[in-house]
Swiss-Prot record:
Subcellular location: Cell inner membrane
NCBIfam families in the cross-refs: NDH_I_N (TIGR01770), PRK05777.1-3 (NF004440)
Membrane topology: Multi-pass membrane protein
InterPro entries given in the database record: NADH-Q_OxRdtase_suN/2 (IPR010096), ND/Mrp_TM (IPR001750)
Name of protein: NADH-quinone oxidoreductase subunit N
Length: 471
């Protein structure tokens, strides 16, 4: 029974999913209730995670499931991201007539899958979590089934994700075949010498994981899926699954295969460099803001992978800090995007921001701070996120990676500054509606303040993350 206390968050969210589904089926017009209860369920799940003792490494189910500082922190990030997504998307879903009970249930299901992934210490447990997350995301991508683009994006994501899952499963089978176990700790104890079969297994698993975070060259799904999916779903895609996938990267590489760093480090460096360069260059020609943020997120994942490729605790911690700040920046950006509404129609191109500062000065100021932060301009939070990554990379004498990262940051700054130029210097268009959901306004205010004021108290986040020691 003591063990069950450590998985109470997962048990509670599982029961919540079943209860909300039954409530939605048996009670007519219950979308509002189910939606609000889903947000409440996530907040209670977060409280249950906080109740778990800190600085303890608890292993459950024959070491297949772990509860430690890394899992607790990343689960909190995932749950906060999910709660904000549900809170700010209600008006959008109602306008498109997709305010259904299935939406919060699918969000909760994918978050449950992510929580299992984050705590997994076994290839089988990890794969079960991954598939639970993916099955919910396939449906979410095509949730607005009356729109051709949404159905198309769901189908594209399903086909390509199924391919990546197949490669990942093949990699798992190779690792199991050559090590004789699926448990990360057992595999780590056996890994005194490298074997070509194991190296191939690692490569296949890394390919599958790279697809999940849309790292180059496995990014091809991201722009189309981001653009075609409903904006509320795109927001979820952009932030939450990547937190879980990055945690799996950390566990998979630094627990069973830390002794094989010579084999996987070059792969991670390649993924990082390719993602940073491609993400910076490909976004330049984009006019649709959702496609632009897709390419931007590819670049951001490159920076996160740069931290992981260092092979040091500092590198891992810098990547975790980067993902935390990335989540806040994207939440703020999409909050602004959901405010671009006029007569029940949403606008999502750069041209639609033309002269926004004349009619909506406060919204424009928020966008200014968010875009400067995404570009990595001091003293905003995005600058510190990149600073920690570059510091960790340079400490390991990986100068080429740091130079590529800096050059990519300069190139990426161009398209962020181009949007600011459109907002402040182009001719204004008809003003947008101002009667927004209080949660949407609160989300934008909260996330923008975090971006602006992070430099005053950066030590708090660093102090929490410094407790996460993997190596």
């Amino acid at each position: 029974m003591d063990n069950l206390n450590f998985i109470l968050p997962e048990i509670f969210i599982s029961l919540s999913i079943m209860f909300l589904l039954l409530l939605g089926v048996y009670k007519k017009n219950s979308s509002n209730i189910v939606h609000n209860l889903a947000v409440g369920s996530l907040l209670i799940t977060g409280i249950l995670i906080f109740n778990n003792p800190l600085d303890q490494n608890i292993s459950l189910f024959n070491d297949g499931y772990v509860v430690d500082n890394l899992s607790s922190f990343m689960k909190i990030l995932t749950i906060l991201g999910g709660a904000f997504v549900l809170s700010i998307s209600t008006r959008y879903l109602k306008i498109f007539k997709i305010f259904l009970i299935e939406y919060p249930v699918l969000i909760l299901s994918s978050i449950l899958g992510m929580m299992v992934m984050i705590s997994s210490n076994d290839l089988m447990v990890f794969y079960i979590g991954l598939e639970l997350q993916s099955l919910a995301l396939y449906v979410l991508a095509s949730f607005n089934r009356d729109q051709l683009k949404s159905s198309e994006s769901g189908l594209k994501y399903f086909v390509l994700s199924a391919l990546s899952s197949g490669l990942l499963l093949y990699g798992c089978s190779l690792v199991y075949g050559f090590s004789g176990s699926t448990n990360f700790n057992v595999i780590g104890d056996l890994m005194n010498s490298s074997h070509y079969g194991l190296t191939f297994g690692i490569v296949f698993i890394l390919v599958g994981l790279a697809f999940k975070i849309s790292a180059v060259p496995f990014h091809m799904w991201a722009p189309d899926v981001y653009e075609g999916s409903p904006t509320a779903v795109t927001l979820f895609f952009a932030i939450v699954p990547k937190v879980a996938a990055l945690t799996v990267f950390i566990r998979f590489l630094y627990i069973p295969f830390v002794n094989m760093i010579d084999q996987w480090q070059p792969i991670l460096i390649f993924l990082s460099i390719a993602s940073m360069i491609f993400g910076a260059i490909a976004a330049i020609g984009q006019n649709n803001l959702k496609r632009l943020i897709a390419y931007s997120s590819i670049g951001h994942m490159g920076y996160a992978l740069a931290g992981l490729s260092t092979g040091s605790n500092e590198g891992i911690q810098s990547s975790i800090v980067y993902m935390s700040i990335y989540l806040v920046m994207n939440l703020a950006f999409f909050s602004c995007l959901l405010m671009l509404k006029r007569n029940d129609a949403y606008y999502e191109t750069i041209d639609d921001l033309s002269g926004l500062s004349k009619n909506h000065p406060i919204l424009s100021l928020s966008l200014l701070a968010i875009l400067f932060s995404l570009a990595g301009i001091p003293p905003l939070a995005g600058f510190f996120a990149k600073f920690y990554i570059f510091k960790a990379v340079i400490e390991q004498s990986m100068y080429f990676l740091a130079i590529v990262g800096l050059l990519s940051t300069v190139i990426a700054a161009f398209y962020y500054l181009k949007i600011i130029k459109v907002i402040y210097f182009d001719k204004e268009k008809e003003s947008y509606d101002t009667d927004h959901n209080i949660w949407l306004k609160g989300s934008l205010t909260f996330s923008t303040l975090l971006i602006l004021l992070y430099f005053i108290f950066p030590s708090k986040l660093l102090e929490i993350v410094s407790r996460i020691n993997i190596i």
